[in-house]
């Protein structure tokens, strides 16, 4: 039986222009970092994607190494795209990235032209696409000249394999340089994807949002819920069914050492604030990011379709009082959760 999307889907989502481009992204986008590998049930993935699109979420964000195993998220997404979303391809924004380890040998990671363009070709094959809407340099590679990375991104657009290009976890200084390098190719930098949330505010401290705004570049925040810390799930310890319990000390994963007393105090205060606002902690965390018009979109993940419905309700209240903002600034400590700092510090 052919699946038909909700005909009212565009009436319940906000869409924002991405920097100075003509492209609009949904305020909430779906990230496929977790829960879309071969270890996850395909029907669960199908339900999540269908629910997202029915809610007006038109942007699906992937990377070459998402899984596990690496590449499997793109393979699964490609299958579901063919089976459920083929008729809606022109209503979707599909992005992928390359930067982290993907295959053995010296050409399987980084920012070289060899790696980036080979990875893009592999991603297109896995997803069954002729092009992606956005192709990212996933991280800074200090061993590759930025001029080379920029040339690869420009080639992706010029060859018709990507409509736009972006970067992720770049410092303001490197972001500015990438803007200028791409400008030489007459290719605009569309978007930057940084880790950003209430407990990880390096974006604020570094002035990245100002750099993006000054150059007409959009911003899409990933880990807006601090990989689950800002959902309220860990207020009373580590549940047995939680990702923190499953992942242990995984690199760039959610680990027990993140539950410091300072972070727990911050979570308790944020939970109280959310209750006073009539929101869940997760909804308030999303609202806090989207209160700033410089944030184009926020990348959310989901293990269940129902989570998406709760998250979308965050859009009903994006206003914060002066008192609320002051309380956050004064009492919410940095949680030392920027696990991608090795890239943004370079």
Swiss-Prot record:
Keywords: NADP, Oxidoreductase. Coiled coil: none annotated. It catalyses: a primary alcohol + NADP(+) = an aldehyde + NADPH + H(+); hydroxyacetone + NADP(+) = methylglyoxal + NADPH + H(+). The record marks 61, 66, 97, 138 as: Important for catalysis. The keyword Transferase does not apply. Homotetramer. Homooctamer. Belongs to the shaker potassium channel beta subunit family. Aldo-keto reductase that catalyzes the stereospecific, NADPH-dependent reduction of L-glyceraldehyde 3-phosphate (L-GAP) to L-glycerol 3-phosphate (L-G3P). The physiological role of Gpr is the detoxification of L-GAP, which may be formed via non-enzymatic and/or enzymatic racemization of D-GAP. Also contributes to cellular methylglyoxal detoxification by catalyzing the NADPH-dependent conversion of methylglyoxal to acetol. However, the catalytic efficiency of methylglyoxal reductase activity is more than 2 orders of magnitude lower than the L-GAP reductase activity. This is L-glyceraldehyde 3-phosphate reductase. The lineage of its organism: Bacteria, Pseudomonadati, Pseudomonadota, Gammaproteobacteria, Enterobacterales.
């Amino acid at each position: 039986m052919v699946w038909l999307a909700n005909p009212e889907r565009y009436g319940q989502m906000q869409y924002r222009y991405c920097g100075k481009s003509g492209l609009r992204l949904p305020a909430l986008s779906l990230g496929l970092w977790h829960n879309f590998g071969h270890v996850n049930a395909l029907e669960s993935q199908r339900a999540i994607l269908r629910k997202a699109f029915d809610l007006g979420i038109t942007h699906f964000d992937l990377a070459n190494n998402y899984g596990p195993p690496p590449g499997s998220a793109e393979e699964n997404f490609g299958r579901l795209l063919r089976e459920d979303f083929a008729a809606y391809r022109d209503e979707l924004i599909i992005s992928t990235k390359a930067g982290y380890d993907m295959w053995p040998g010296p050409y399987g990671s980084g920012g070289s032209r060899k790696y980036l363009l080979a990875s893009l070709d592999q991603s297109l094959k896995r997803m069954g696409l002729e092009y992606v809407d956005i192709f990212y340099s996933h991280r800074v590679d200090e061993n590759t000249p930025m001029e080379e990375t920029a040339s690869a991104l420009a080639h992706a657009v010029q060859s018709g394999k990507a409509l736009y290009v972006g970067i992720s976890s770049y410092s303001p200084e490197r972001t500015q340089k990438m803007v200028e390098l791409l400008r030489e190719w007459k290719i605009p930098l569309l978007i930057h994807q940084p880790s950003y949330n209430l407990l990880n505010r390096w974006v604020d401290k570094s002035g990245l949002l100002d750099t993006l705004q000054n150059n007409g570049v959009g911003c899409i925040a990933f880990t807006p819920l601090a990989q689950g810390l800002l959902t309220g799930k860990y207020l009373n310890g580590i549940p047995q069914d939680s990702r923190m319990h499953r992942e242990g000390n995984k690199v760039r994963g959610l680990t027990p050492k993140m539950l410091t007393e300072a972070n727990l105090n911050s979570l308790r205060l944020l939970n109280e604030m959310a209750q006073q606002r009539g929101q869940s902690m997760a909804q308030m965390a999303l609202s806090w990011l989207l209160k700033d018009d410089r944030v184009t979109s926020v990348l959310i993940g989901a293990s269940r379709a129902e989570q998406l419905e709760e998250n979308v309700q965050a859009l009903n209240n994006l206003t914060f009082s002066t008192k609320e903002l002051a309380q956050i600034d004064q009492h919410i400590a940095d949680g030392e959760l920027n696990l991608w700092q090795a890239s943004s510090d370079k």
